A protein has these predicted regions:
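Non-catalytic substrate-recognition/targeting regions of SAM-dependent transferases
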Residues: 1-32
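Conserved beta-strand segments that form the floor/walls of ligand-binding pockets within enzyme
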Residues: 6, 22-26, 41, 82, ...
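Short loop segments at secondary-structure junctions
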Residues: 11, 191-192
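Generic structural signal for well-ordered alpha-helical scaffold segments
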Residues: 12, 43-47, 141
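Short, glycine- and charge-enriched coil/turn segments that flank and shape catalytic ligand pockets
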Residues: 12-22, 50-52, 113-118
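Conserved SAM/SAH cofactor-binding pocket of Class I
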Residues: 29, 33-111, 120
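S-adenosylmethionine
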Residues: 49, 83-191
Length: 192
């Protein structure tokens, strides 16, 4: 995935390059193994945007793969948020096995959330359906600091214009976009 990120099943043996950042994952029931185009594009964007010491929020965290990748890339702390209890359990378990339970928090719910202070995150990722992204655009932008990055994915190319309009109306600026098959991912910056 990307330049240095490698996602492997936790039970698999893997020998890679010294520069590889290996993320071992047992996906369980929750979505997010790194192989679906939307997850793959999110991971590529995370590799491009996460800097050492940043604070990361994953809305719709599923298996926790995006948080694990962000932490492996140097994020200081990651918060996962999901409406599905199975995803919360899976994400917590994967973060613990990956050795990141001390640097992560997983909460049930969506944004806005009492445990998610406005402007507290440098990078926010949301790999969720277009209609949900449109509804949450303002809350996602509120969660990120001024000049911070929001990565959206889970959007079919036919809905990309609607998602971009919602984020631009809420104060987001498109920084980059990519597409695999019919799926898109877009990186927005919160206007200063």
């Amino acid at each position: 995935v990307g330049t240095n990120l490698v996602i492997v099943p936790r039970s698999a043996e893997f020998t890679g390059r010294d520069s590889d950042i290996v993320v071992g994952l047992e996906p369980g029931l929750a979505f997010g193994t790194g192989h679906h185009p939307t997850t793959l594009m999110c991971l590529e964007e995370i590799e491009d945007t996460v800097k050492s010491g940043c604070r990361f929020l994953d809305v719709g965290c599923g298996s926790g793969v995006l948080s694990i990748a962000a932490l492996a890339l140097g994020a200081e702390h990651a918060v996962g948020l999901d409406i599905d209890n199975d995803a919360v359990v899976s994400s917590k378990a994967n973060l613990e096995v990956a050795g990141f339970s001390e640097r992560s928090t997983v909460l049930q719910g969506s944004v806005p959330h009492k445990g998610i202070p406005d402007g507290d995150f440098d990078v926010v990722a949301a790999n969720i359906a277009a209609n949900v992204l449109i509804k949450l655009a303002g809350a996602l932008l509120a969660a990120v600091s001024e000049g911070g990055v929001i990565i959206t994915s889970g959007v079919l190319d036919t809905r990309l214009g609607d998602v971009v309009s919602a984020f631009e109306s809420a104060g987001g600026v498109v920084q980059a976009s990519r597409q695999i098959e019919d799926w898109t991912a877009t990186r927005f910056v919160r206007a200063k």
